[in-house]
A protein has these predicted regions:
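C-terminal beta-strand-rich structural cap/linker in extracellular carbohydrate-active enzymes
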Residues: 602-620
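Acidic/aromatic-lined carbohydrate-recognition and catalytic surfaces
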Residues: 37-43, 91, 99-297, 308, ...
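Beta-strand-rich binding/interaction modules
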Residues: 571-597
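Bacterial N-terminal signal peptides that target proteins for export
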Residues: 8-24
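C-terminal motif of bacterial Sec signal peptides marking the signal peptidase cleavage site
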Residues: 32-35
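Loop/helix patches that line or flank the sugar-binding groove of alpha-linked glycan CAZymes
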Residues: 119, 344, 419-422, 434-573, ...
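Conserved alpha/beta catalytic core and glycan-binding cleft of carbohydrate-active enzymes
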Residues: 226-227, 232-233, 237-262, 338-339, ...
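Short, low-complexity, disordered segments immediately C-terminal to signal peptides
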Residues: 37-72
Length: 620
């Protein structure tokens, strides 16, 4: 649910699946001077899990931008814990003395209402429709399948806590295409027949609007399909032209592409002519000529068509390749397109993919685009993975704070777009091996979701899905069930390797209170309860941070929140003396949430925090 799970302040909301651990005798609590400690169950970690092999780069056919992984110099940390952080404030102490009658204390997050704001700071769920949910049994996911699973993403009901709580969906391409991934568009004004109809798409938008979900769709403007009528008409025209000179008044689409009689890098022959066309990604993906005024007019029509239907914005593919090797021209086009979209729909959200190092992609904010994906923290070589695998926790905080200055110098209104993995990267469950791999998988996911900006979550990451190597493996079917024949299950992309998942399917994880799935739900809930997390200006508290601790303060408007990440493998204590939040000293009453990845709970006593391995404390 988007704004879901609100409860009146002070009222305990007992979640489904929580259990009373011991029956309380009448008057027991009043007579017991010792009180009751909150007991907890945590999950057994996947002790022998082996790390999956990491894939080599992206296939040329992905069409999703440059293959080069950005080389980030800094790394950093954050963390989180399973959704069963049962004894938040009074009951966080763990076990109780022998003979004491106790009950499990409701998590503090259950008593805090959601505070979801309808703006551009959201939690987006990336959906590859092909592999998400199949409604008609043909093995291919479709729009009706996605509609049937919207309640999983967000049911729009504040009285429930059974959904993830994402309030945005990023749809990978849904336009007609000859390939499974659909990053080569044949028709920019329609829906691929394998996914459904335009009526299905409109039904999806209406269902999302009722739930408070903003839908952004992938818009591929760097290139089209070679089967796009624009390209086919231009090639036919050149064949008929013979030795004559092209005239765009005779064939307007000739100007939509880069045709030349000289073969340059990344160029391919137009069969039956002495002409060549540019296609930097793949021969069947001819590059569009974005200098063409006629094409820009067409692009303006395309954007307006989808915005008028109710789409909330666009994810722009491969923005650094619009004019390969020419950042200035790329930024100029982005600036033009941003202006076109905002004039049509002021609150439309735009996020661009510029797979570059931070100092290089930061300059694209000069275009005025809302967001750029934060590649610095993503993937196996990014800051999050490095910190979880042993780099100093402090580097997560230092880099988080530094980003503000780097991006802000180009656009003070930027909105960061942190993500951990996407359809071009190996899935994060393969980044970690050994007895702590499940803890690390959880913790790393929280590090991403607790960052400022609009956070993005790739479908299935909340289950710890596996997938590496070639692109098809990274886009495996959503793991609803271990039964591949179960209703809704997809067959997966053609040529996908056969492999087993590392962690349980959703069916099992829903029943496991300490699962990765429940952990992710809790992280998103904390994000939705505290708008400072997404919107706050970051202050890195270097004096409290180090190898195993990272402490961040975020301020939004007149409110502050503090995030403490502990990456150490043992339990450690952090002194919070002399620290204040919102004008008050920190105490047990400051707790807004705890995220643990094992049985041991985070405890705040006085002005000290005792934190087990891979845990997070949220204070306000």
């Amino acid at each position: 649910m988007d704004k879901g799970g609100k409860t009146d302040m002070g009222v305990r909301h007992w979640k489904t699946g929580r259990r009373i651990l011991a029956v309380m005798l009448a008057g027991c609590m009043l007579l017991s001077s010792a009180g009751c400690g909150g007991s907890s169950q945590a999950g057994s970690e996947n002790a022998g899990a082996q790390e999956e092999p990491e894939g080599a780069g992206r296939e040329g056919q992905s069409g999703s931008g440059d293959e080069g992984q950005d080389g980030m110099q800094e790394e950093g940390q954050a963390g989180s814990e399973n959704g069963a952080s049962d004894g938040a404030q009074d009951g966080m102490a763990g076990g109780n003395k022998a003979g004491e009658a106790t009950e499990e204390i409701t998590d503090v997050t259950d008593t805090i209402p959601l505070n979801v704001i309808d703006d551009s700071y959201r939690t987006y769920y990336e959906v590859f429709v092909y592999s998400f949910c199949d409604s008609d049994g043909d093995g291919i996911g479709d729009l009706q399948g996605l509609i049937s699973k919207l309640d999983y993403i967000n049911d729009g009901d504040d009285s429930t806590d059974t959904d993830l709580g994402c309030n945005g969906i990023w749809l990978m391409p849904v336009n007609p295409s000859p390939t499974y991934h659909k990053y080569d568009v044949m028709d920019y004004y329609d829906i691929d027949a394998a996914y459904g109809t335009m009526e299905d798409f409109q039904e999806l938008l209406a269902a999302c609007e009722r739930r408070g979900i903003k839908v952004i769709m992938d818009l591929v403007l760097n290139h089209s399909s070679s089967q796009n009528p624009w390209f086919m008409e231009a090639c036919d025209y050149l064949r008929e032209l013979g030795d004559g000179e092209p005239d765009v008044s005779e064939c307007p689409s000739f100007a939509y592409y880069h045709f030349s009689k000289e073969k340059g890098a990344g160029c391919y022959a137009v069969e039956g002519t002495d002409w060549y066309y540019e296609a930097q990604f793949y021969s069947e993906m001819p590059d569009l000529n974005l200098d063409s005024e006629a094409l820009r007019t067409e692009i303006e029509k395309i954007a307006g068509f989808w915005l008028d239907l109710g789409v909330g914005g666009f994810r722009l593919d491969a923005v650094k390749e619009f004019y390969t090797g020419n950042p200035k021209a790329n930024i100029e086009f982005l600036s033009w397109f941003t202006g076109v979209v905002k004039e049509r729909k002021e609150d439309a959200y735009l996020v661009g993919e510029a797979w570059l190092g931070i100092s290089d992609y930061a300059q694209y904010y000069e275009s005025g685009i809302d967001s750029l994906f934060n590649f610095a923290f993503a993937d196996k070589g990014g800051i999050i993975s490095k910190v979880v695998n042993g780099s100093p926790a402090s580097r997560y905080g230092a880099e988080s704070a530094a980003l503000q200055e780097t991006f802000g110098q180009y656009n003070e209104n930027y909105i960061d777009a942190p993500f951990y993995t996407n359809h071009d990267m190996g899935r994060s469950a393969g980044y970690y091996a050994g007895e702590n791999s499940e803890k690390q998988t959880k913790f790393a996911g929280a590090m991403n979701l607790l960052m400022s900006g609009s956070a993005f979550l790739y479908y299935g990451e909340e289950l710890g899905m596996k997938g590496a190597g070639k692109d098809e493996n990274k886009r495996a079917p959503m793991y609803w069930s271990k039964d591949a024949e179960k209703e809704g299950m997809c067959a997966g992309p053609p040529d996908m390797d056969a492999f087993e998942m590392k962690f349980d399917s959703l069916e099992e994880q829903e029943q496991e209170s300490d699962s990765i799935y429940h952990y992710y739900k809790k992280v998103i809930r904390i994000r939705n309860q505290n708008p400072e997390i997404a919107r706050g200006e970051v202050t890195y508290l270097e004096e409290l941070s180090g190898d195993s601790f990272c402490v961040l303060r975020k301020q939004w408007e007149d409110s502050e929140i503090m995030l403490i990440f502990h990456t150490g493998e043992g339990t450690e204590e952090l002194d919070l003396k002399n620290l204040t939040l919102n004008g008050a000293e920190i105490s047990e009453k400051s707790i807004r949430g705890t995220l643990e990845t094992g049985e041991e709970k985070v405890v705040v006593t006085g002005q000290k925090a005792v934190m087990p391995s891979y845990s997070i404390l949220v204070l306000k």
